[in-house]
UniProtKB/Swiss-Prot annotation:
Main localization (coarse): other
Lineage, top ranks: Eukaryota, Amoebozoa, Evosea, Eumycetozoa, Dictyostelia
Function: Myosin is a protein that binds to actin and has ATPase activity that is activated by actin. Involved in the process of phagocytosis and appears to support streaming behavior.
Organism: Dictyostelium discoideum (Social amoeba)
Stated name of the protein: Myosin IC heavy chain
Domain Myosin motor per the UniProt entry, residue ranges: 15-698
Length: 1182
């Protein structure tokens, strides 16, 4: 498989080998030569199988860690791209996902070799690729990712320092565990820290610095913090000037302090806790400035009490108690098990300085541990899942003077080397032997003997001897170091140990190191004086007290744990944790001790190559196997690759796992030399073979996905075709429904437009029913209340006459006549324009001035003053409107019923309506006037004579208007002639004792020639109107179709002739206003007596009504020939108002199909063959 180089790799010429297992000649010199070639070309990473070798370049290589490079390594195997720390991170993360096992990355090497930077890149990669980048729905995941990245600057500030070998040397060890959820997203974490070099707080070698945070704080603190905590430049504090080095080349402490503050904020440390941290840092610096001066009697006293006072203020402890704790040591005499007397023993200057430094070291050590615990608290995840650990621990150190700290650091590195040997050399070879694999053992150095020298119990190791001496000398300092050198001589039997005067030498895997004996016992005790502990626990600062929860037990004889015991226990726990995980190794190399770029010292690097055991590692890798797995695990991973073990992604194998493994390898044509079968595992020799299997496995799913996609595309194409057909059918169906809906909506709008007027009319009819004879014009059921028959809003002369009322909403208007009372003549009717608004009644008269018609306001009556109405009981048109404060209004109008209804509706109440043969009302000038009403059958016109109205008889007072059918959907509407009957239309039942108007019988002509009445004028909107009657077949006059004329009764004109018959079905006019069709002709015998039953009237109330004829069921039997249909001729034109009705013209011939009831018949129009309902009084039989 050809390697694909990322962009940064393609920009440089590849020198040397990416994988040193491919060296033609294996030797340390060849390894050095390969590393040197690559280093000179800025290629710092090289592989030995799965082990990454990293050489510290001491410079930034442009593009090596960019986001583009990081993305290229996602999902790639280690042989596909050049060696890189991202490749190790990718393999670690994918191994956790695929193998479902914990992983760890062990980074080893000496101080300054680049371990910390490698650890940061590992965590950066895992945080970047795990989950969905920057878009995770889980806020906890995003928070943990932020903490993973921000712990590095925070812990580096408090735990790293400049040393002679490294400008950013880790002075503590940490093992960072990243915990993942089921979605493989980081959801928790834990940091374990090891052996902080707290002695650096009070002492540094020449050329070294204290921990970074002190210099950052001194230079980056705000003016307020400087004032409050007494912070100045680092040159002002004794603890920061021990090494005579205050700066690091290329490092800005102010910028670094800003990063440290930001890390605290991201991790979640609140401002008040940050303030306490900085306060304790200032206290430590000022403790270092406390100096002592000797006095007589080997005593000391504090030289400058102002410094003591300021330290007391920072620690929130009483100044005199702190002074006593620093100048004296509390002692207690004992008598057996009984406590004796306590007294203070003065300290000499050396003891006082040691006590002062011990106090500063204890505060910093507890503060550092608190920071680690605070980070762990933010990342705590109670649900434990898979884990990836990253070990970044101090590297192997050798100085001119090496003490207890270097001894502990090198011990931990010795343990890590032992783990490396166990996994890469010893355990691998032992496994080959155990599995029966053909193998030639390769000798290697096992450093187990060195580890036993340091941590052994029998014979005792160096740590055990240190603890024994500490217990023996207890609180005595004199002679402790000499006692150690005497006791440690028992280790001379170990070939890796030797004594040299006041020191001893240990032959580590990385070389011989001489450790100085003096001071080791005191540092191993690692105890805080009881006096100092007591003074800290009495502090008023709860944060400081929380750092020292120790319980002081003066009666306990148990000695506290030593530093050696703690580091040995922590190392054992670390090894146990690492052994439970699958390890991945990064071996770092330091190219020079000058910490300068582009310099590789051959001898220095060769020494590291040797003690790291790279040569042995290459030999074992070349002779060994790249991959091994149990039969079952291999089968479960790769069963997809053989047709014998898999079908459509399902496991179909029925045999044992070993046979399945053979079948899988055979199906992939793997040669027998490329693998071996052990007792329980299968071993793959070359990594290329393993990656080929993985690529085939991935391609299987790709091929399956392609097949599924093709099938899905075919299904989608089929679905699309079906969808188009359904859409077309549905579109046609929607068009059909739309056309139907439009037709229905047209009828519904017409019905809806008329419905409120009909309802208002039907309600108002109850006021008149049985109390006043009715005009035939009023009985036309189709006529709706139009209201504004004069169209006042478009007539400016009306608006001008109304003056202030011109902006009022008009609800009624018509031409009318009012009763006027001339002084010297009889009362008479005078023409007026009657306009009713929502506020008042207006009477406007037309007056001629200088041959010009002028409209003037005659009278205005507010609606609020209208109290009641009076009408006669006869068929006249007089309406008297009574008012509360003005004289009454006596007006004649064809629309009296509508006028009463609209005024009642506007006032929101039903005013009293009085009926009688005479009406008394107040006329102008405050006097009363009485008009009477007389029946006069000799005159068809209504006329007024001497306050008497002469009126012919009208329709009986019990006559009612037929209600409009409001449910046309229940009546079938055939679209073409059919032979079967149609259901009976729904006709409203008459109310109370009233009757519904029927077709009248023909009336006899009068003795003289018929008197033609003036046509009824209509409003501009189209008011009801009548035409002159045409002669009936018998010679009697018949009503013609009325022609529209401008608005209500003409002023000064006579009353309108009423139609001879009423129609019980609504017929709309083209303009939306009601329009009368031709009425049926009157009978030759003339009008019937008033109140007498005639063919035009239904049965009186109380008698049963004829039920509607039910629709007969069709029968399959052949019917006999139907008799010839009865034919009728249309007397008037009729426009259908509802879907089931028939539209016809005058003189059209109609075949009668069925008489549904007396009012409505079903017929067939001969001209168009259409079938529908028709009013019976509009036709006459031929």
């Amino acid at each position: 498989m050809a390697q694909q180089k990322p962009e940064w790799g393609n920009q440089m010429k590849n020198e040397g080998l990416d994988d040193m297992t491919l060296l033609s000649k294996v030797s340390n010199d060849q390894i050095l030569d390969n590393l040197k070639k690559r280093f000179e070309k800025d290629i710092i990473y090289t592989n030995i199988g799965d082990v990454l070798i990293s050489v510290n370049p001491f410079k930034f290589i442009d593009g090596m860690y960019s986001d583009e490079v990081l993305q290229e390594y996602i999902g790639k195997s280690r042989i596909e791209l050049p060696p890189h720390v991202f490749a190790v991170a990718e393999q670690t993360y994918r191994s956790m996902i695929n193998e479902k096992e914990n992983q760890c990355v062990i980074i080893s090497g000496e101080s300054g070799a680049g371990k910390t930077e490698a650890a940061k890149k590992i965590m950066q990669y895992i945080a970047d690729v795990s989950g969905e980048r920057g878009s995770s729905s889980n806020q906890k995941v995003e928070h943990v990712k932020s903490i993973i990245l921000e712990t590095n600057p925070l812990l580096e500030a408090f735990g790293n320092a400049k040393t002679l070998r490294n400008n950013n040397s880790s002075r503590f060890g940490k093992y960072f565990e990243i915990q993942f959820n089921q979605k493989n997203e980081p959801e928790g974490g834990k940091i374990t820290n090891y052996l902080l070099e707290k002695s650096r707080v009070v002492f540094q070698l020449k050329g070294e610095r204290n921990f970074h945070i002190f210099y950052q704080f001194c230079r980056g603190a705000t003016p307020q913090e400087q004032q409050e905590f007494g912070i100045y430049g680092p040159e002002n504090f004794a603890y920061l000037t021990k090494g005579d080095t205050l700066d690091i080349d290329g490092v800005d402490d102010v910028e670094e302090f800003a990063l440290t503050r930001n890390a605290m904020n991201v991790i979640g440390i609140p401002a008040n806790e940050q303030k306490q941290i900085f306060k304790l840092l200032a206290a430590i610096l000022w403790i270092g400035n406390i100096d002592f001066k000797e006095q007589a009697g080997d005593k000391v006293t504090i030289a400058d009490t102002s410094v003591l006072d300021f330290v007391s203020q920072l620690l929130d402890v009483p100044s005199h108690f702190l002074k006593t704790a620093l100048e004296f040591r509390q002692m207690e005499t004992r008598h057996g098990n009984q406590r004796g007397t306590q007294y203070n023993v003065p300290l000499n200057k050396t003891q006082a300085i040691a006590g002062r430094d011990a106090l500063a070291k204890a505060i910093y050590d507890r503060l550092f541990n608190w920071l680690v615990d605070r980070i762990n608290k933010e990342m705590d995840n109670p649900q434990k899942g898979l884990m990836i650990g990253v070990l970044d621990i101090y590297g192997f150190e050798v100085f001119d003077r090496n003490g207890f700290e270097q001894f502990c650091i090198n011990y931990v590195n010795e343990k890590l080397q032992q783990i490396f040997i166990e996994f890469t050399l010893k355990m691998e070879q032992e496994e080959y032997v155990r599995e029966g694999i053909k193998w030639e053992p390769i000798p290697f150095f096992d450093n187990k003997i060195v580890c036993e020298l340091i941590e052994g119990k029998n014979p005792p190791g160096i740590f055990s001897i240190l603890d024994d001496v500490c217990r023996a000398v207890h609180s005595q300092a004199e002679g402790a170091d000499q006692k150690l050198l005497q006791s440690i001589a028992v280790c001379k039997s170990n070939p890796h140990f030797d004594t040299r005067g006041n020191a001893f030498c240990v032959k580590h895997y990385a070389g011989d190191v001489v450790y100085e004996g003096p001071g080791m016992i005191e540092k191993n005790k690692d105890t805080l004086l009881k006096d100092h502990l007591e003074i800290l626990q009495m502090s008023a600062n709860n944060f400081l007290v929380g750092l020292f929860p120790d319980v002081i037990d003066t009666d306990s004889k148990k000695l506290p744990s030593t530093a050696g015991f703690k580091i040995k226990s922590q190392a054992a726990e670390l090894v146990a944790t690492l052994m439970k995980s699958t390890p991945h190794y990064i071996r770092t190399i330091k190219p020079n001790d000058l910490k300068k770029p582009n310099i590789l010292e051959g001898g220095r690097v060769l020494h590291q190559v040797k003690y790291l055991g790279l040569l042995d590692n290459i030999k074992v890798r070349r002779a060994g196997f790249a991959y091994r797995a149990t039969f079952d695990r291999f089968f479960q991973r790769y069963y997809l690759l053989s047709d014998k073990t898999c079908y459509a992604g399902n496991n179909i194998w029925k045999g044992d796992a070993l046979s399945a493994c053979r079948a899988i390898l055979a199906s992939q044509n793997v040669d027998n030399t490329q693998y071996q079968i052990g007792k329980t595992k299968i071993f793959i020799r070359y990594p290329e073979m393993l990656f080929s299997l993985e690529e085939t496995r991935e391609r299987y799913w790709h091929d399956m996905a392609s097949r599924i996609k093709n099938a899905y595309r075919n299904y989608k194409a089929f679905q699309f075709e079906c969808s188009n057909r359904i859409k077309n059918a549905f579109r046609n169906y929607k068009l059909y429904r739309q056309r139907c809906a439009q037709t229905i909506q047209g009828y519904f709008r017409a019905w809806k437009q008329a419905s409120p007027f009909f309802d208002l009319r039907m309600q108002n009819e109850q006021l008149f029913q049985g109390r006043k004879e009715r005009n035939r014009f009023s009985m036309i059921s189709v006529r709706k209340y139009f209201g504004d028959y004069l169209d006042v809003r478009s007539q400016s002369y009306f608006l001008d006459a109304m003056a202030e009322g011109r902006n009022e909403d008009v609800i009624f208007s018509s031409k009318s006549q009012v009763m006027v009372h001339p002084i010297l003549s009889a009362n008479k009717l005078s023409p007026r324009f009657l306009i009713v608004t929502k506020q008042a009644i207006y009477l406007i008269k037309l007056k001629q001035k200088k041959n010009l018609a002028t409209y003037l306001l005659d009278r205005r009556v507010p609606l609020a003053e209208v109290t009641s109405f009076s009408l006669s009981s006869l068929a006249d048109n007089l309406l008297v409107i009574h008012t509360s404060t003005q004289f009454d209004v006596a007006v004649t109008t064809e629309f009296k019923t509508e006028l009463v209804a609209l005024i009642n509706k506007q006032k929101g109440t039903t005013l009293a309506v009085n009926f009688g043969q005479s009406i008394q009302y107040f006329k102008k000038k405050g006097s009363n006037n009485t008009v009477t009403f007389l029946k006069d059958e000799m005159h068809k016109e209504i006329f007024l004579k001497k306050n008497q109205f002469h009126i012919a008889s009208g329709l009986p007072a019990s006559t009612t208007v037929a209600k409009v059918r409001k449910n046309p959907s229940q009546v079938s509407t055939p679209s073409k002639p059919i032979a079967k009957p149609v259901a009976k239309p729904m006709v409203a039942k008459p109310s109370g004792g009233s009757v519904i108007m029927k077709k009248p019988a023909p009336a006899a002509p009068p003795s003289g020639p018929p008197v033609m009445k003036k046509p009824a004028p209509t409003a501009p909107g189209g008011a009801p109107m009548m035409k002159k009657p045409a002669p009936a077949p018998g010679g009697a006059p018949m009503m013609k179709k009325p022609a529209p004329v401008p608005g209500g009764p003409a002023p000064g004109g006579s009353a309108i002739m009423k139609p001879a018959g009423g129609v019980s079905k609504p017929l709309p006019s083209p303009t939306g206003a009601p329009m009368m069709k031709k009425p049926a002709p009157t009978a030759p015998g003339g009008p019937a007596p008033a109140g007498a039953p005639t063919p035009m009237m239904k049965k009186p109330a109380g008698q049963p009504m004829m039920k509607p004829i039910a629709k007969p069921q069709p029968t399959p039997m052949k019917k006999p020939a139907a008799p010839p249909p009865q034919q009728y001729i249309a007397l008037y034109e009729y426009d259908a108002m509802q879907p089931d009705e028939l539209t016809f013209k005058e003189n059209d011939v109609i075949n009668l199909i069925k008489k549904v009831d007396a009012d409505w018949w079903q017929g067939e129009l001969v001209r168009t063959k259409q079938i529908g309902m028709l009013p019976s009084n509009y036709v006459q039989q031929i």
